[in-house]
């Protein structure tokens, strides 16, 4: 079987856990930062379009729910398939691992085409449902329609990258993201300002960039990776059905997490449009963008740790699973403590990245401080969710995805502004309250269920 000889691979079975996680997480961190540029660069440039920047920025924020739905489907098949892929490789069953990857790829492509058609058909009514005013719709509709054309390459680039990382090629995974992100960085000012396409130009630049990333991912997995990608053939369908069920079952937690993020975004925008108007939708767009920036290294550490945890769990090495979980938790908590301090002490610095509008700045500073007041508790949710997903604990992963967002955040988004008369502050305050409650419950449950299982596995060896 052909292998990539010129790229150093990570040995999940041997080597120190800390080095393995860092070797996987650092390239992923670079990749995640570059991936963040897809959306952040758009927002920075859009906010600076003469005369219409603030309104256009809010309009892009109204498109977030649909973009999050696309990410949700990518996670359903990518994050659902990759841990199973790693577990099978840890067991030495590479044939099943390859079938899992191909099943994920086939389902991902099919869902991308269906999703694109549905969203294009209902783009205008969906944006209105999300809280778009007539002014906002003028900017949001063309941006969204162009963005949706790139649904398939966007989902391939996002959903299939975990299978590159799961084979130990984290640097290649980083490179696949870098190609598109750098292209977007170059193309955005060209299409927005030089060609004078405004907000439409931002969408065109993003679609072209996503196409470049997706092309690289397919090329590598088809021709260079150890386990190669292909569509599932008709005669393989019966054999793949069980794998498809397992992929969807495990991926449902990541799917639900992104889907509920979309639902929360819709609810927040609806309440803010009533209690604060269009300017507060722009404020929420900035707050959400800063959250994405802050969370990027956390996602990198999680995704860098996940294949190591899954592989060693499949290989029945509980000591390495436990150590990987502890290392992941320490890295995440240490990083968050630093970023939490910066957000609370220097919010202006972060907001200035997106806009220097005086009225926007005044409202955004207080909103940012409230929103991130208990952000460190969110780490407990991330750690618990990653462990559950990596160990194929489907029910727990799905439950805790739903608990914090659906049963805590969304009700509070309406209760705090209206029932408690907190207005716009209530929308932003719903987040820290949910972090404390949901994060604590998830983490404690993880400790009480996973540690005894690892102890039992150790005794059985």
Task: Briefly describe each language-model feature range.
Residues 57-117, 154-173, 269, 281-341, ...:
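Small-residue-rich hydrophobic transmembrane alpha-helices
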Residues 33, 37-57, 127-134, 190-197, ...:
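Helix-terminus/linker motif at the lipid-water interface of multi-pass membrane proteins
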Residues 12-52, 65-80, 84, 109-116, ...:
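N-terminal transmembrane alpha-helices
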Residues 1-25, 85-150, 194-251, 309-374, ...:
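Short alpha-helical transmembrane segments in multi-pass integral membrane proteins
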Residues 75-78, 147-165, 173-184, 202-217, ...:
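Short runs within selected transmembrane alpha-helices of multi-pass transporters and secretion channels
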Residues 31, 35, 39-46, 71-78, ...:
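Alpha-helical transmembrane segments and their lipid-water interface positions
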């Amino acid at each position: 079987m052909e292998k990539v000889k010129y790229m150093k691979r990570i040995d999940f079975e041997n080597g120190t856990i800390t080095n393995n996680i860092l070797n996987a997480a650092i390239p992923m961190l670079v990749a995640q930062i570059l991936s963040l540029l897809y959306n952040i660069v758009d927002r920075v440039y859009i906010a600076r379009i003469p005369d219409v920047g603030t309104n256009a920025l809010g309009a892009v924020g109204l498109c977030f729910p649909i973009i999050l739905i696309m990410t949700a489907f990518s996670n359903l098949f990518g994050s659902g398939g990759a841990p199973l892929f790693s577990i099978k490789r840890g067991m030495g069953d590479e044939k099943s691992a390859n079938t899992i990857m191909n099943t994920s790829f086939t389902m991902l492509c099919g869902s991308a085409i269906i999703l694109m058609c549905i969203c294009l058909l209902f783009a205008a009514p969906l944006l209105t449902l999300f809280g778009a005013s007539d002014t906002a719709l003028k900017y949001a509709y063309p941006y969204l329609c162009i963005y949706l054309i790139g649904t398939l390459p966007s989902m391939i680039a996002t959903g299939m990258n975990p299978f590159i990382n799961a084979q130990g090629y984290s640097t290649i995974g980083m490179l696949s993201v870098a190609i598109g992100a750098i292209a977007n960085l170059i193309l955005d000012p060209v299409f927005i300002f030089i060609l004078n396409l405004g907000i439409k130009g931002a969408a065109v630049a993003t679609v072209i960039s996503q196409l470049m990333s997706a092309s690289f991912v397919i090329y590598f997995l088809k021709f260079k990776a150890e386990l190669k990608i292909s569509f599932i053939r008709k005669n393989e369908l019966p054999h793949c059905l069980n794998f498809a069920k397992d992929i969807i079952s495990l991926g449902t937690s990541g799917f639900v997490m992104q889907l509920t993020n979309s639902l929360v975004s819709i609810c927040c925008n609806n309440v803010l449009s009533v209690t604060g108007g269009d300017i507060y939708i722009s404020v929420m767009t900035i707050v959400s963008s800063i959250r994405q920036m802050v969370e990027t290294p956390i996602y990198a550490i999680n995704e860098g740790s996940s294949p190591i945890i899954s592989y060693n769990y499949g290989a029945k090495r509980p000591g390495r699973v436990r150590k990987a979980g502890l290392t992941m938790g320490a890295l995440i908590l240490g990083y968050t403590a630093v970023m939490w301090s910066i957000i609370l002490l220097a919010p202006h610095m972060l907001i200035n990245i997106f806009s220097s509008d005086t009225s926007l700045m005044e409202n955004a500073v207080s909103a940012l401080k409230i929103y991130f007041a208990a952000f460190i508790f969110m780490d407990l949710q991330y750690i618990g969710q990653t462990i559950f997903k990596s160990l194929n604990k489907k029910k727990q992963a799905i439950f805790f995805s739903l608990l914090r967002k659906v049963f805590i955040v969304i009700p509070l988004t309406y209760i705090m502004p209206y029932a408690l008369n907190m207005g716009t502050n209530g929308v932003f305050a719903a987040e820290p309250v949910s972090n404390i409650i949901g994060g604590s419950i998830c983490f404690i449950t993880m400790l009480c269920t996973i540690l005894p299982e690892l102890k039992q596995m150790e005794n059985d060896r």
